[in-house]
Amino acid sequence: MINEIKITDLSEAESYAFGTNNKYDIWISATDEEDMHKIKRMKKLLHNKGVTHYYQFFYDWSDEDGIEWDHLETLGPQLKHVENIINFLKPFVDDDKVHNLGVNCFAGVSRSTAIGIIASVMTGKTPYMAFDYIKTVRPMAWPNLRILRFASDILKQDLKTTIENWKRTKIGGIYTGGWS
């Protein structure tokens, strides 16, 4: 079971990998390919601390602005990326042992918070409860709707609408995307 989730940016994740804190026994990194050397170094350091680390490279692009971007289908989050993340998490969610999960992306705002919501929903929380929890651990959360759309399809539960509705209520101009 996943007990606690920590959301960080890449810099804080690197500090954790180099540090002596061993609170988190599983870690997911979702970053751009340009950060590959940092992530591979982190993986080695986390492994030496006994942390199971998984990483996925894709850009933090979403389709929530209502514009069709050709690069989304090659560089943005893909269904296979989200499937891989869910498949990585499943044994830890189903395990009777208590696990603490760390998640990072470059800024700790979009990809990582979406993954945190996915992990929380997999543990039995509703999407609303999951997002509420993630906002307490990462107040600047702005989850990637494309990732949540794919997760909704895989988990057969709507993770996207709660966050999409929340984004609509935020201060004017921050989210100007179209919803279809």
Indicate residue ranges for each PLM-predicted region.
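A phosphate-binding catalytic loop at a beta-strand-loop-alpha-helix junction
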Residues: 100-118
